Amino acid sequence: MVNNGGNIAKLANELSDERHAALITSDISRRYFCGFTSSAGIILVTKEASYLLIDFRYFDKAKERVSDCEVILLENAKTQLMNLLIKHGITTVSVESDAMTVTELEKYKANYTFVTFDSSCGLSEMIGKMRIIKTPEEIEKIVKAQRIAERAFSRLLRDIKPGQTEKHVAALLEYYMAEY
């Protein structure tokens, strides 16, 4: 299980009341809040609970790795999200203004007329500020990555030879980092 230093709880605490939720749609924010990388999925955060709705390609792995959200197999996004919004009595949903297109926002507004979708609430900025302050877990990952990079680069310096292309050297470095 991945521990993300309570990032979901921090976001939930920023919500104004029990009828307010945050909808996380960007890959980067999903990874930040769940510690899980995927090319699809959404996170719904309420004061009471949080949910990761994710498709079949990632579902089993997400169930194993994600601890801060209830992981739900994404089958019918419109219906599933509607049921969660109704279940929690949500009337306002903050969205990431820098991650959602106008077209996507309009679709959400059309599909969920009982909810106000707010792109001007500063959710993207709030997430950005949260990401600036590193948790102990994040610092540990940074230190580990730095050590891997240093070991790989030291090895690369021993193996690099005149006449090798940049692509070859880059491939070697990438290979060495993967080894460590």
Task: List PLM regions with ranges.
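Flexible, acidic/His-enriched mid-domain "rim/lid" segments that flank
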Residues: 3, 79-180
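N-terminal accessory/capping or targeting/presequence segment of soluble
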Residues: 1-88, 147-148
